[in-house]
Each structure stands twice: as structure tokens, then as C-alpha cells.
Amino acid sequence: MSYQGGEFDVIVVGAGHAGVEAGLAAARMGANTLMLTLNLDAVAFMPCNPSVGGPAKGIVVREIDALGGEMARNIDKTHIQMRMLNTGKGPAVRALRAQADKFLYQHEMKKTIEEEENLLLRQGMVERLIIEDGECRGVITNTGAEYRAKAVVVTTGTYLRGKIIIGDLAYESGPNNMQPSINLSYHLQELGFEMVRFKTGTPPRVNGETIDYDKTEIQPGDEVPRAFSYETTKYITDQLPCWLTYTGDKTHQIINDNLGRSPMYSGMIEGTGPRYCPSIEDKIVRFNDKPRHQIFLEPEGRHTSEVYVQGLSTSLPEDVQLDVLKSIPGLEKARMMRPGYAIEYDAIVPTQLWPTLETKKVPGLFTAGQINGTSGYEEAAGQGIMAGINAALRVQGKDGLILDRSEAYIGVLIDDLVTKGTNEPYRLLTSRAEYRLLLRHDNADLRLTEKGYEIGLIARERYERFCEKKAQIAAEKKRLESITVKPSKEVNALLEEVGSAPLKEAVQANVFLKRPEVTYEHVAKVIPAPEQELSADVAEQVEIQIKYEGYISKMLQQVERAKKMNDKKIPEDLDYDAINGLATEAKQKLSEVRPLSVGQASRVSGVNPSDISILLVYLEQGRLAKLGKKTV
């Protein structure tokens, strides 16, 4: 028996990392929002690694914060350790990574949601969508509750027809033995969505009290205070270490001897797994020439003995997992608390989405996170905030927000998904971004805070601080151009100390700073101080912008050329079959993806430069024909 559960502007289905960002974004933009989740105790749950950030992913977390999202602030309050990665490399690949207290992370995120004014959090299993006049108008739960809305965001993670597999044991389940969502997956197929079956996995957890840490290498956090959020002012200083150990010949022998019992090789697992996060049995087979593989031991929180055995993701039978653990230095006597497992789940083919993450088949329906074929909390959260923003903008009758590939890693992620699709769980990598020098950890606010303010996610007070920071950067760059550094004894002594060639003639301070060995801190020692003391963030930004000015300038020229192609819009209803000369494959792929611009069309798999030339001629002929009609 059904009943009317209420009317909302936006409904978010799921409260994982995509769902919480979607719900908070929509609510903070003024939309009356309902968030439905299978289990109130699993809000922002971390079923796999207890960490946030890393290469590319850490920059996404910064971007979420710059737009006005929550992940960065939450991990800053709940981490047990932070490290800046790739500090010996250029700024384009530097990224922050935090070990989370996964239980505190959940608690704090749930508290934030419960306290949000326009957001109602409720437990319930959504089984069907309400479709009226071809549009999504709400959801129906298994208890018969009908909730109506102007937009719905589905963020179901790995719960859609979830199946856990350990050895020859397989059963319907969401992650960590939670209830799966079965009927919603079938309903999406009924609506005509093309689905795929993906797989991911997780390693065993062991009791930290039973680890022999003397046989491992300690991995401490950075002593320098770190934070993801631009708003964080209080830093956690009592960090917990992680530890490093390795597999060995014995480990590899045990796994090789039991490959016949592995679901990966017995045919039990049908779903495609993540290329960049392989199981330990996959690593042993694919990289059989490697004598050992890294294993990181990561505490799951401050008030638990559970330790995550990172690098040992597996679906081998439980008895084999125990033998594998005993073969690893430091884990000989470790007690397993939870076995590793593989989980299969359904996802939609993401080329069925517009770049706003609204589905093409059903207007008013948005999807975000692992349902779109991605892996990782950060990728999910990045999609979540964009889906929430665009759902709220739809309710407001406004155009959606689409981030360009040159503006954000989130833009790269979404463009890759909706334009190219994915045949495996998609992981964001720095190599996927052609403009990665522009998409740095340090400048996410300069790229996106303006947009966050315009849509109503950034408060005026924060925006004013941001504007002041921009002004300070510009003023200091200009000041350095006006100051001359002369080849004095003091200057050349400094240069000798840092291993740089002596200065032979006077140069501008900004030119002096361009020397590879010279930092802003060095420059500050040999020139007058600015009227106002600069923050470390401003000084870092000044240094990077000056040092990489030439490279950045070249990349901006590339962006401008690409923009010309992106500015050439394509009608949504364009009949590609009517374009003479277009290759058959191009017609099929373009009809499926329905790119919104020539730039996007050029990135569709199977579309060649010759196809783009023909498309450009066709669009130009259409434009001229329209002009001719207007002048008649």
C-alpha cells in the first residue's frame, strides 16, 4: 500500500560520498532536499581504504572545497595523518593524502547533514522512480512511501545488485555485508538504461595489537601542518603512523598454488575490475617477475584495533587469506578480523548522461558516483557536488554548471565519462589531464571559488577573503617586477649556498625568482619586505606563477585554441545520419554520445579528424542557411 511521503525540490538516493555532497550542495543552494539511504549508520561510509586524497584525487578534494563542498573540511577534522606527495616533483603533480579515522569521518559527516537547514536525512530503500510525462518526478520506497520532487539524484555506489564473493562463496550484499539494492537496478533497466557489471575488492583487516611492527618500516605523517580546505585554521598535530612491509617468495607461492580456488580465475567473477587497483592474485600473475609488492598497514581509526592491509585486496578463500597474511613480515601472528572480498555491482553506461550528469533518457534524473562507472571516494564526491548543483539549478530554472577540462580535474573526470565512457571502473589520474599544469593542488580556489560564489555555495565573507588573496598575489607579482636585485656579496653568497650560478648583472626580482634553485623565501632575504606580510599560500602562489610563467602561458594558448572548438555548439537533436561523408562509426558514436560542442565531438572514441572536418562544414552550411532565411 502506497502513501504520500512528502514533496521536495530535490531527492538524493544514497548517502555515500557522492550522495552527501549532492544533498549538501542542493540544500545549501536553497533547495528543499530529501536524502534517502539504506542505512543511517552507513552515511559517508568508507568500505575500502581509510584514506582521502592522493595523486589527482587530492586535487579533486581541493576543488570540491573551492566550490563549497564538504569532503575537505570533514577530513581536516577527522584524519589521523597527512602527507604531501611528490614534493620532489613539480607543482602539477603534488597532491595531499590523508589517513582517515573512518568512524569519526562518518560521525562528523552525518552530524553536518543532520544540522543542515534545508536537508532531511531519512532511512529508506528506493525501488522505483516516479516518471510522469517522460520526466523524473520522485521516488517510491519498498515501504510504499511516494516522495515527489522536481529533480532526483541517484548515488547508489556498489549497492545495485551487489554480490560479495569470497572463494567459492557468493551472496547478495552491499559492501561490508550491508543490504543491497536489487529492484532499483531492474527498474533502471526497464526504463531503457544500458547497464554494465563491474567489480571491485577490498583486503582483509587485522588486529593491530597482533602485528610485529619491529619487522616493518614506519611511515609517519608530515611534521608541517597540512589541510585540504582553504578554510581550515585548526590543525591536528597528534598523528598516528602507518607501516610498510612487503610480500615475498612464500606469499607468491601460496597464491600461485591456490589460483584455481580464486574466483578471479575460476570464472565466478563476471564483472570487470579496476585496472589501477588490482587484487594481490592479479598482481602476482601480471607481474610475475617482481620479487615483492608493497603492503601498507593503515589504522582504521583512533579507537579501534582494526588495521587495513593496503595492497592485499583479494577474493581468495578465507583459509588461503590466513596463510597469505602469515607469510608477510610483521603479520606472522596477526589475527584477521575481517576477510577480504570482491564485490560485483551494476553501473550505467555513462555516455547516457549529459555533461551536467542529467540522464538523456529521463530529464530530471541525475546520477553520480560509482553508478556512473567510477572508482574512489573522491571521484564520487566530485560528481556528487556537480550533480547536486545541477539538480538545484534545474529546480531554479537555470542553465547547468559544466566545468571545462582546463578548469578542473572534476571537469576532466565528467568529460571522460560522458564523452568516452569506460569499460572498467574509472580512476582519475594526472595523465588524463592535458592541462594539468593549470589544475594544481595550490590553485583550486583561484580556479573555482568564483563559480562557487556565483551559484550560492560560497558565503560572502569567504569570498571577500578570496578576493583579498587574489589582490595580494597580483600586487606582490607587480612589486617584484619593480625591484632590482644587484650582484652583491650577500646575493652571490646566497646563490652559492643554494647551488646556483653567481649573479653578474642586476635583474628584476621576478627574473631572479625564476632560477630553479631560488625560492620566494630566498628572494625575500635580499629585497625589502612588502608593506603587508604575506601568508604562506600567497607566497607559494607568487612563486609558482612566476617560475612557471612561460609554461603556463603556452598552456593557456592551447586552452584558447580548444575553446574555439568548444564554442562551436551542436544542436542536441542533430541527425548525424543526414550528414553525407561522415563515417558509419562516427555516425553511431556521435548519435550515442550527442556531444554539445565540436570540441566534445572531437574527443568521442571512434571519431576521426576527417569526421570533425565534415561535421564543421555541415554545421557552417546550416548556419549560413539560417542566415539566408533571416535575410529573405
Swiss-Prot record:
GO terms for biological process: tRNA methylation; tRNA wobble uridine modification. The keyword tRNA processing applies. GO terms for cellular component: cytosol. It is found in: Cytoplasm. FAD binds at G14, A15, G16, H17, A18, G19, V126, S181, Q370. Keywords: Cytoplasm, FAD, Flavoprotein, NAD, tRNA processing. GO terms for molecular function: flavin adenine dinucleotide binding. It comes from the Bacteria. Signal peptide: none annotated. Its cofactor is FAD. PROSITE patterns: GIDA_1, GIDA_2. NAD(+) binds at residues 273-287. InterPro entries: FAD/NAD-bd_sf (IPR036188), GIDA_C_N (IPR049312), MnmG (IPR004416), MnmG-rel (IPR002218), MnmG-rel_CS (IPR020595), MnmG_C (IPR026904), MnmG_C_subdom (IPR047001), MnmG_C_subdom_sf (IPR044920). NCBIfam families: mnmG_gidA (TIGR00136). Belongs to the MnmG family. Homodimer. Heterotetramer of two MnmE and two MnmG subunits. NAD-binding protein involved in the addition of a carboxymethylaminomethyl (cmnm) group at the wobble position (U34) of certain tRNAs, forming tRNA-cmnm(5)s(2)U34. This is tRNA uridine 5-carboxymethylaminomethyl modification enzyme MnmG. The lineage of its organism: Bacteria, Bacillati, Bacillota, Bacilli, Bacillales. The gene is mnmG.
